[in-house]
Regions:
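N-terminal amphipathic, basic-rich helices that act as targeting or association modules
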Residues: 2-174, 440, 514-530, 534, ...
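Thiamine diphosphate
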Residues: 4-5, 27, 188-210, 216, ...
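Glycine- and acidic
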Residues: 19, 36-39, 86-94, 113-125, ...
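Non-catalytic terminal/interface segments that mediate subunit docking, oligomerization
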Residues: 84-105, 109, 116, 130, ...
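Cofactor-binding active-site loop characterized by glycine-rich and histidine/acidic residues
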Residues: 89, 93-101, 105-118, 126-268, ...
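Short alpha-helical segments and helix-capping/turn motifs at coil-helix boundaries
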Residues: 119-123, 135-145, 150-154, 205-209, ...
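Residue-level marker for buried hydrophobic side chains located in beta-strands
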Residues: 246-247, 275, 540, 646, ...
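A structural-propensity feature for long, helix-poor, extended segments
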Residues: 246-247, 253, 631-652, 657
Length: 899
């Protein structure tokens, strides 16, 4: 195992034996071993020393000696002072620019919270987060982060959400944002404001990635980095010089999503990925690990998972003290001090630090005897030393073969003084008094006179000043300004005609039955054959290909694996063997719905991130979709994703035997909450084909910012085929699929998914046994019908003097008499959405599958949830009796209602 060049040990290392285990029974022998190791390092280098230590450890294991493992290193910087890369920038100019940005970020938040609307309340905002991050952002923007240009695809920046004021402050200096926009921070309704956090939906030409709610940024970024490798491996885009940078807080790492995929990043050698964890030791309420050390904890998590870990804890002002620490006493105190105390040090003063930190040992107290309290106070953490930050970033971007994580220690609220610096309430601090503002100005040398301070004016140097010239020169050298988002891809595609997919549009052969899942697979297979669009298809699986009958794709297009297939698959002699390939097209995520969704988001936003239109198809158990990764689905809407989500084995009664946790009766209700998610619950193969084709037209050909959710069934039955002229009605959400006789009385039966077939069966029962005619309407999208109705009602509300418009539901039903009964395999709320759009005076009954699912056969489940053909008949007759079309006694004769 090669040595990590960032962890070399100097020959004048401290005498660690002085603070070694007091149980050392032979200190002379220990010293001889230590001296021998030092000699090897000096004469043959750290790599040889590393090799010898590995051999010794292995030998000890072979002798059955229990060897405790620790993924931790000392509580010091990974990069020694004499090994750090020198920053090529103008340190003084960069410091002044950071000061201006700190001021403008603070002013933006404070100004916003001085507004006093009549309805009360504050706009909020955060000063402390950017205050701790300013030096980190400065290094990145000035020296590392490439914008998209002719020779570079652009780096991807996942910005810590609460630090957004600092990003706006930089963009203001760059001339990309106006003072008016800064004055309208968090005031967006008028169209001239800035969003609270990174939201591409709200600022589509600025923010690339949505990073709140917390935890989503780290997870999505890992799969983004992996997707860049995927694109490169498949020859779709050259991404080899691009990096994915992720900024997150140490408190944010408690979100399970934050660390949930770090193993994948190491397993796939994502050396294009850099995590920067802002370790200011604080979260909103208090310390992240008051009694412990969050940096050491995170180091072990990441190093144990196979990451390159770079710790930056101490600024340059500590270097001379550490160099004098020959006995390792200072290092031991650094390690023994817990995070709660470190926070207290920064919330107090130099005298407090002298007594409570250096005063823990007379030898360290002597070290600082000639230093004033101010000198001690100015011993800064590493994240506020721009030269050390540069060195850490430089090391990370030049590391090969592993993802890198930088654990950088900072102070939350740095520069805010007594009102916020290191205080528990700093996250909530958004109002500063006049004296606090004056101290802030003085600390950062902002050239604003006392006479103007009350207004907290923004500060922007003249364009011809050295600072402004430097600001623009650095971004020019890196290809342009960031963050910046592409709204459309430069490339364009024409979707093949609907006729191309006739295999799913035509009726099934006599005696042949298929499921809508099979219809989807047929459509996908045909699309993969298209020379233009086929290579852009990204099938995403979560260990369910065989469940959905998709294993035939394994050999056809292969499963992406950057290592290829280094084993002989057990089914190699079969036609559909499990084929992994460096250029494979399928993304197989394993049992990992959240990971699958992140891969889908990366592909679904590729038009923007990579200027390459990709077409992701992510299929999964519908119950484990929105319910499991709902926050990511919302983020996908925010990021204007385009692609297909396919909920398999959908419906509460369709999945035999699986029970409560598997049977989905509400995914469409959850999908309806996302404004740009277009959802369908088709019954027939031709509906699946029409909907998928329409989705391709909207998202690929027209580049509309929507994504589709389509539920699929595993129930086999004959398919009737597409009736010409119904395509548009299918897309709108409702069409007459089986007209009844001319008898009276009449009812209208609505349904979707598998329960539509129960409505068709009920139609026959009503006519044969009760003399009631029924039209059967397929409603592939109650959600789209509801949205159309709501839009219609809004138009009518805002245009009272004009003739009212009719909703699509109203248009379809107004010419067909009788009460209306809607039945679905989902909760009643699903079909209840259209109640107000049913023509006036008509009775509307809804049957649904409210309650927990359970295991049994389909017929028994449908009887249990009261959605089978017999209950539809009862509902129809009851509705007719309520309208006076039949006597109530007739309903009583057939009622199946249980006590």
């Amino acid at each position: 195992m090669a040595a990590n060049p960032n962890e070399t040990t100097q020959t004048d290392a401290p005498n660690l034996s002085a603070v070694a285990d007091v149980l050392d029974k032979d200190s002379q022998e220990t010293r001889e071993w230590m001296d021998a190791l030092s000699a090897v390092i000096e004469s043959e280098g750290p790599e040889r020393a590393h090799f010898l230590l590995e051999q010794l450890l292995e030998h000890a294991r072979q002798k059955s000696i229990d060897m405790p493992f620790s993924a931790n290193t000392g509580y010091v910087n990974t990069i020694e002072a004499d090994q750090q890369e020198r920053c090529p920038g103008n340190i003084q100019i960069e410091k002044r620019l950071r000061s201006y940005m700190r001021w403008n970020a603070m002013a933006m938040v404070v100004k916003a919270n001085r507004l006093h609307p009549a309805d009360g309340g504050d706009l909020g905002g955060h000063i402390g987060s950017f205050a701790s991050l300013a030096s980190l952002f400065g290094a990145g923007f000035n020296h590392f982060w490439h914008a998209e240009s002719e020779n570079h695809g652009g780096d991807c920046l996942y910005i810590q959400g609460h630090s957004s004021p600092g990003i706006y402050a930089r963009a203001y200096l760059e001339g990309r944002l106006t003072e008016e926009q800064l004055l309208n921070f968090r005031q967006e309704v008028g169209g001239k404001g800035l969003s609270s956090y990174p939201h591409p939906k709200l600022m589509p030409e600025f923010w690339q990635f949505s990073t709140v709610s917390m935890g989503l940024g780290p997870l999505m970024a890992i799969y983004q980095a992996r997707f860049l490798k995927y694109l490169h491996a498949r020859g779709i885009a050259n991404t080899e010089n691009r990096k994915v940078w992720v900024f997150c807080g140490d408190g944010e790492m408690d979100e399970v999503e934050s660390l949930g995929a770090i193993g994948l990043a190491a397993r796939e050698n994502l050396d294009n990925l850099v995590f920067v964890i802002n370790c200011n030791l604080q979260r909103l309420d208090g310390p992240v690990r008051g009694n412990g050390k969050i940096i050491q904890e995170l180091e072990s998590e990441f190093r144990g998972s196979g990451w390159n870990v770079i710790k930056l804890l101490w600024g340059s002002s500590w270097d001379s003290l550490l160099a004098r620490d020959k006995e390792g006493i200072l290092r031991k105190i650094m390690m023994d001090t817990n995070d709660g105390d470190y926070q207290s040090f920064k919330a107090n003063d130099g005298a407090y630090v002298r007594k409570n930190f250096f005063g823990r040992d007379p030898r360290t107290l002597e070290m600082v005897a000639k230093m004033s309290d101010d000198d001690i106070w100015n011993l800064r953490r590493g994240g506020h030393d721009s030269e050390k930050v540069y060195a850490a970033f430089h090391s990370a971007v030049n590391h090969k073969g592993q993802p890198s994580v930088l654990l950088i220690k900072t102070v939350k609220g740095f520069g805010m003084g007594k009102i916020g610096e290191g205080k528990n309430n700093v996250h909530q601090t958004k109002k500063l008094g006049d004296e606090d503002i004056k101290l802030f100005r003085d600390r950062f040398n902002i050239p604003i006179p006392d006479s103007q301070l009350a207004d907290i004016p923004f500060y922007k140097p003249a364009d011809d000043t050295p600072e402004m010239k430097y600001l623009h020169e650095r971004r020019k050298a890196l290809g342009g300004y960031l963050p910046e988002r592409r709204t459309k891809a430069d490339e364009s595609f024409t979707v093949p005609s609907l006729e191309t997919f006739k295999a799913v549009l035509e009726p099934t052969a006599e005696g042949r039955e298929i499921s809508t899942t099979q219809a989807y697979v047929r459509f996908l297979t045909q699309l993969l054959r298209d020379q233009a669009l086929g290579p852009r298809v990204v099938p995403i699986l979560v260990d369910e290909a065989r469940t959905f009958g998709m294993e035939g794709l394994f050999r056809q297009i292969g499963i992406y694996n950057p290592a290829g297939q280094q084993y002989t698959p057990v089914d190699k002699d079969q036609v559909m063997y499990y084929k992994e390939d460096k250029k494979g097209q399928i993304l197989q995520e394993g049992i990992n719905e959240a990971g699958g969704m992140c891969s889908w988001i990366a592909a679904a936003t590729s038009y923007s991130t990579n200027n390459r239109i990709m077409i992701p198809f992510y299929v999964y158990y519908s119950m484990f979709g929105f319910q499991r990764f709902g926050d990511l689905a919302w983020a996908a809407g925010d990021m204007l994703a385009r692609g297909f989500l396919l909920g398999g084995t959908s419906g509460r009664t369709t999945l035999n035997g699986e029970g409560l946790q598997h049977e989905d009766g509400h995914s469409h209700i959850m999908a309806s909450t996302i404004p740009n998610c277009v959802s369908y619950d088709p019954t027939f193969a031709h509906e699946v084909g029409v909907i998928l084709h329409h989705g391709l037209k909207r998202m690929v050909e027209k580049q509309e910012n929507v994504y589709f959710y389509i539920t699929l069934l595993n129930e086999n039955y004959a398919m009737p085929g597409l009736k010409a002229g119904t395509e548009e009605q299918i897309i709108k959400g409702m069409y007459l699929c089986k007209e009844g006789s001319k008898l009276t009385p009449r009812v209208q039966l609505l349904g979707s998914g598998t329960i539509l077939r129960e409505s068709i069966a009920a139609q026959e029962l009503l006519e044969k046994e009760w003399g009631v005619a029924a039209n059967v309407w397929s409603c592939p999208s109650f959600n789209e019908l509801a949205r159309d109705g709501q839009n219609t009602e809004r138009w009518n509300l805002l245009h009272p003097a004009e003739a009212p418009r009719l909703s699509f539901v109203g248009e379809q039903l107004e010419k067909h008499t009788g009460p209306v009964v809607a039945s679905t395999d989902y909760m009643k709320a699903f079909a209840e959405q259209i109640r107000s759009f049913i023509p006036k005076g008509r009775t509307y009954k809804v049957l649904g599958t409210d309650g927990f699912g359970r295991s049994d056969f389909r017929s028994k489940l449908r009887e249990h949830f009261e959605v089978n053909r017999h209950y539809i008949v009862v509902a129809a007759l009851k509705a007719l009796s309520e309208e006076g079309a039949i006597p109530v006694a007739k309903v009583a004769d057939v009622s199946l209602v249980k006590d």
